[in-house]
Every structure is written in C-alpha cells, then in structure tokens.
A protein has these predicted regions:
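A contiguous loop/helix-start segment that scaffolds small-molecule binding in enzyme catalytic cores
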Residues: 23, 33-39, 51, 57, ...
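A short alpha->loop->secondary-structure connector
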Residues: 3, 60-64, 86-88, 141-147
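Short, glycine-/small-residue-rich phosphate/pyrophosphate-handling segment
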Residues: 79-101
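Class I S-adenosyl-L-methionine
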Residues: 1-72, 169-172
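Hydrophobic packing residues within well-ordered alpha-helices of enzyme cores
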Residues: 1, 59, 78-79, 135, ...
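Glycine-rich, charge-decorated loop segments at or immediately adjacent to ligand/cofactor-binding or catalytic sites
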Residues: 76-83, 161-164
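Structural signal for conserved beta-strand scaffold positions within catalytic alpha/beta enzyme cores
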Residues: 9, 68, 88, 96-99, ...
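A short acidic, often aromatic-flanked loop/helix-cap motif at beta-alpha or helix-coil junctions
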Residues: 13-18, 74-75, 103-105, 158-160
Length: 176
C-alpha cells in the first residue's frame, strides 16, 4: 500500500471480532461512496464462509462498482499445507466443505448429516473445533464409521499450525 493509505484492521477470531460484519459492510460502502479506492483483504476465498457475498450485496444495493479477486480457500490450502489431499484417485473421489459453526440465530441445523456421513469421501469442516463433539456425534449417528481417519488442524498455514491425526470416534476427546 502507498505510504498515505489508510489501513483499518477488522480481523476476526472466534468470539473476538474487532468489528461486527454489518459495521464492516457499512464502512466499505461509506469509503467507496466517498470516492476512495477500497481494498478489502481477506484470508482464503471471500465466498467460502468469508462473508464476501454479504459485502457484495451491500455494495450492489448502494450502486457502487466493485470486483473480487479470488483467493485459495482454506478448505484446501490448510489440508494441503498439512500434506493431506482432499481427493486421491484411489481413496477419495469427492469432498464437501461444511461450516463447523452454523449461525446460531437460524435455530435448527440445515446440515444434511445423513448425506454427508455416507455419500461424501472427504469432509472439511471449517471453524469447527468448538463444535467437534457435535460434529463427530452427528456423523457417527448417521452412518460414518467411528474408525474413519480424521485430522484436526488448528491455525492452518500459520507458523503455529498444529495437525492432529486421529479418528472420527476419538477426535473430540483427543482435542479436549
């Protein structure tokens, strides 16, 4: 960025948001409406649980031009960084990316546990460590073997990345 660029940190960590998403949306609209060139940097792909869609709607409704530069989703990048392919022609021919942290205001879960447990080879749950007990319980209850290999990866692609190789049946206890 240029020396005179204004930089606003709006990063988020679990239960620690420096700015709420509606406020981020308003800030993007405000700065763009003032004629400023706004660059919103995000980790991963802004359209995979990255709130890019929400930001785009706000900018569209305000009649402001914008563009997105695709990123590499952490759903693949983190697994790759740990040396784990999400597909492999001899082992896994499909994968799904699922939120591990559904919006608590929507009430009932909309995750298709039976479909995920039996119809998809590799399951990638993002933001799921805090809900790991619920995730593994639902997978096993819907037909996924407790002996299925699993990896729990925290702080993906960062120097402090930690990868735990475990099973679906023991993952929650192993992380606790």
């Amino acid at each position: 960025a240029k020396d005179d660029a204004e930089m606003v940190y709006v990063g988020k960590a679990s239960a620690n948001h420096t700015m709420r998403q509606p406020d981020i949306n308003k800030l993007l609209v405000k700065l763009a409406a003032e004629g400023k060139t706004v660059a919103r940097l995000k980790g991963g792909d802004p359209f995979v649980f990255g709130r890019g869609g929400e930001e785009a709607i706000e900018l569209l409704e305000a009649g402001l031009p914008f563009e997105f530069v695709p990123g590499v989703t952490s759903a693949i990048a983190v697994a790759e960084y740990a040396g784990i392919p999400v597909t492999h022609r001899h082992v896994a021919t499909s994968f799904a990316v699922i939120t591990g942290h559904e919006d608590p205001t929507k009430g009932e879960s909309t995750i298709n546990w039976s479909g995920l447990a039996t119809a998809v080879d590799t399951l990638v749950f993002l933001m799921g460590v805090e809900n790991l007990t619920n995730i593994t319980k639902n997978l096993i209850a819907n037909g996924r073997s407790a002996d299925t290999p699993a990896a729990v990866i925290r702080w993906g692609t960062k120097p402090e990345q930690r990868t735990l190789i475990t099973t679906v049946g023991t993952a929650a206890a192993d992380v606790a």
